[in-house]
Regions:
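Extended assembly/interaction regions that build large supramolecular complexes
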Residues: 1-193
Length: 193
């Protein structure tokens, strides 16, 4: 679990960190002794000192299959006192048909934020180091929803049509893409949004 006294959660740093591997330092970091400088640096950036604010919550790692086919790392963090925010960090890894020689390898990091006082919920996710057979799989998704005086709902997987003006507050999203060929003489890529 995580206990951070007199600290807040910088969701903007976490959101940017989805693309840079910041969750590696928070959710069950590999080899914490060797990676301690990077882990402490990331933790200081994500959880900066803030008097009177506290962040607590459990973390869990779920594995399914023997050998493991699916691994899900989750953290449910609550920032107290009011205004209360709930932050969910997630990391998914799917290796099919087995870990030693996966034909399908999907890795995704995700961040969810429920801000009770702002009456909003957001979810961001990004694929990294993913492939189907030898073809690289990439892409981002974002969800924004609000209730109360300004209800809204936006869900984008792979971004928007180039001529569509994206609503404010959404990050630039990479297309959901499968790279079929990436050579000097031939490039073939399937993209969707």
């Amino acid at each position: 679990g995580l206990v951070a006294l007199h600290r807040t959660v910088r969701t903007d740093v976490l959101r940017d960190g989805l693309k840079t591997g910041t969750l590696n330092s928070i959710l069950f970091p590999p080899d914490p002794l060797r990676n301690a400088p990077q882990i402490f640096s990331d933790l200081r950036r994500v959880f900066p000192p803030t008097a009177g604010r506290h962040v607590v919550g459990p973390m869990v790692q779920l594995r399914w299959g023997s050998p493991t086919l699916l691994t899900l790392d989750l953290a449910l963090l609550i920032e107290l006192p009011a205004p209360i925010r709930v932050v969910v960090l997630g990391r998914l890894q799917v290796l099919l048909p087995d870990q030693s020689h996966p034909l399908v390898q999907i890795r995704m990091d995700a961040l969810g934020v429920l801000d009770v006082s702002a009456e909003t919920v957001s979810l961001d996710a990004t694929l990294y180091d993913s492939r189907i057979l030898q073809f690289t799989l990439t892409g981002d998704m974002a969800l924004r929803a609000g209730w109360g005086r300004q209800p809204q709902f936006v869900l984008a997987i792979g971004g928007f049509h180039p001529r569509f003006a994206a609503p404010p507050g959404l990050p630039a999203l990479k297309r959901l893409a499968l790279q079929l060929a990436d050579g000097d003489s031939l490039q073939l890529r399937c993209q969707a949004y």
